[in-house]
A protein has these predicted regions:
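Short, hydrophobic-biased segments on the C-terminal half of alpha helices
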Residues: 233-237
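Short, cationic-aromatic polyanion-contact patches
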Residues: 250-264
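Long, hydrophobic/aromatic-enriched structural stretches that serve as scaffold segments
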Residues: 61-105
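A short, conserved structural fragment
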Residues: 240-250
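Internal, hydrophobic cores of structured domains that mediate oligomerization or house catalytic pockets
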Residues: 86-152
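A structured, charge-rich N-terminal accessory region that forms the first stable segment of a protein
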Residues: 1-67
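Short helix-coil junctions and helix-kink-helix linkers
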Residues: 216-229
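A conserved mid-domain beta-alpha-beta active-site/ligand-binding segment of alpha/beta enzyme cores
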Residues: 135-210, 214
């Protein structure tokens, strides 16, 4: 039986898959990951990290310099790991989110010579508690407990040239458009304007001061398209600069910031 390498696209997904393997929920020789959130920022020249790093420092308000070094190290490691691939089966884990699909597309672009060994696993293919109040469909791998991951192995999809070409055509299109935001909408990843979530942020911002984490949590939880708290926090600060939101407290720290919607 071939060895299995799992590839994930967030720290939480990497941790969950490693835990599932450790507990015998599924098999795997190695778990590697790309944690750069390619749903936002420039993607037309990812190999040249300078523009991505400039973007990180812009939106990672609390940890721009630190996160830049972490993500650079992930890129170096995953490129090194891919160069060592031989005849292992490669499982790419993702959900219906721009973050994980864009990450998967970028990694797939590096695996052209290995597509006969590549399988994709989409965790959004199962809806849990159907018909109940707590019905949910995972948007990203990290929304699942590790014990459930084994259910998806039998649903893995093999990669053929036709499917690979279609996915690479999508990736080329997104890179040409090179928008600073990509979202999952109408069952596909598409380029979007940078203020895509702004109306939703304003909708969940009260007219009296409340902690910013409350607004950010509401947006993340209610948005159809998965989005990170980092990106929404950055948009909050942009709405403060444009005077649509007032603030008090430390503008540089999400948990120390209170916000309210301006009356206009």
């Amino acid at each position: 039986m071939k060895e299995i390498i799992h590839i994930c696209f967030s720290d939480s997904a990497i941790g969950s898959v490693k835990y599932a393997i450790k507990k015998g929920v599924m098999e795997g020789e190695k778990v590697i990951g790309l944690v750069d959130d390619l749903s936002n920022g420039p993607i037309d020249d990812i190999a040249n990290m300078n523009r991505r790093i400039y973007w990180f420092k812009k939106i990672y308000i609390e940890e721009g310099n630190e996160i830049s070094e972490i993500i650079k190290s992930y890129y170096k490691k995953i490129i090194k790991d891919i160069m060592k691939f031989k005849d292992e089966d490669i499982y790419l884990w993702y959900g219906n989110s721009a973050k994980e699909i864009c990450g998967m597309l970028h990694i797939l672009s590096m695996l052209e010579e290995k597509i006969q060994n590549v399988y994709t696993i989409n965790v959004s293919e199962i809806t849990y508690n159907t018909g109940k109040k707590n019905e949910y469909t995972p948007r990203v791998v990290g929304e699942l407990i590790p014990e459930k991951l084994g259910e998806f192995i039998g649903r893995r999809k093999s990669m053929d040239f036709e499917r690979y070409s279609s996915l690479m055509a999508l990736w080329d299109k997104l890179k040409r458009e090179n928008s600073n935001l990509r979202v999952y909408e109408d069952n596909q990843v598409k380029s979007a304007h940078i203020d895509y979530f702004d109306d939703m942020i304003l909708c969940y911002t009260c007219k009296k001061f409340m902690h910013s984490v409350r607004t950010i949590g509401e947006v993340i939880g209610k948005a159809e398209s998965y989005v990170s708290d980092t990106f929404i926090f950055w948009r909050v600060t942009e709405l403060i600069r444009s005077e649509k939101i007032s603030h008090r407290g430390n503008l540089g720290f999400m948990r120390e910031l209170e916000i309210k919607k301006n009356n206009r």
